[in-house]
């Protein structure tokens, strides 16, 4: 039995020129994709079963890290508690994913000082925003 894995799927833009991001939780028992869909001010949370590679719009999947089996429930709770911000004009699916990752740091699911995670987070922060 392998450890659960978190990754971020980066997809072709759905709206405008912003790449779409979603969080992927892979376990031995299920694959869940957490994302927001829509545009300001009508974003909605969506959870689906499947892998990022199930769609042709996937550009790449960034490995965030392995997590402990007890952390599966914590990640699911963090996602459930994550808020959709339909008030802030600049908020989007990329912010949603970054906010969940930061909440996972606060819950000690992810370690901010882990060099691999820090590198992925830096890549995501660099990719944040419109495609140029």
Segments and roles (model prediction):
Residues 14-19, 51-56, 128:
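Short low-complexity stretches enriched in small and charged residues
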Residues 27-56, 63-66:
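Compact, well-ordered interaction domains used in eukaryotic information-processing assemblies
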Residues 15, 38, 47, 97-100, ...:
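Generic alpha-helical secondary structure signal
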């Amino acid at each position: 039995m392998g450890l659960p894995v978190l990754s971020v799927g980066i997809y072709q833009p759905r709206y405008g020129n912003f790449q779409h991001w979603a969080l992927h939780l892979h376990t031995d028992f299920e694959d869940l994709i957490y994302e927001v869909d829509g545009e300001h001010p009508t974003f909605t949370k969506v959870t689906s079963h499947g892998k990022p590679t199930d769609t042709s719009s996937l550009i790449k999947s960034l490995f965030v890290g392995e997590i402990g089996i007890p952390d599966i429930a914590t990640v699911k709770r963090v996602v459930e508690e994550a808020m959709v911000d339909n008030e802030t004009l600049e908020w989007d699916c990329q912010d949603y994913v970054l906010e969940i990752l930061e909440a996972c740091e606060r819950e000690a699911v992810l370690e901010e000082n882990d060099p691999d995670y820090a590198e992925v987070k830096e890549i995501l922060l660099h990719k944040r925003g419109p495609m140029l």
